[in-house]
């Protein structure tokens, strides 16, 4: 009998000294597991270091947000001086059936190691820390985007939940034009506001864009629509995204178009700067 009481006492004593972090870890996993959030910095590294204010002492190269920004949390592990968040990358690609950007799971995983300057004691404290690393608000999400993307997303982002776990896009005007076969192209002859005839720029040096690994793995095909300026020398500038394709192909299209050369537009025989839109097609030939 005394032996049984002694063993029971040991069990109770051991239970008293179990670290409180274990129960908090369970709470955090229940709260965040399988939820998807947008990183403020779309770093490409599979393992990333952060402090509790979201600063990264070992910041890696940045990549397209449609490949590297969205992360679905799979596991949270608490340690005495840090939190480890394991996740799966979630891409954004154009869905031709809906005519919008939509989520698609990628094979790549990512691990976030967050150092703590004080013990983690509550779920609210952890949420505050995550808010420095992920864009929980629509404003923070838009601010995290490259300028190239911002006006496009701002115009067609339908909804962004309070914590950023869900986002929805509207069908853009550019998408409707592509569907209807009426997308803007440089016309053979244009008329300026003062009635003078303007000849459109003509392609002189055009190269094809490259596919991203993520886009290839998803068999993504389609058309990126860009707005740009062709200056008096035939060079492109002020490239802006009008209709995206996702999975890094938009950045690939823009980088390629930067190298294009045109015979410049002319007005009364003189070279002039002109704004136009171009379509960049992505097709996989097997």
Language-model-detected regions and their locations in the chain:
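Bacterial N-terminal signal peptides
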Residues: 5-16
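Mature extracytoplasmic/lumenal regions of exported proteins
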Residues: 80-181
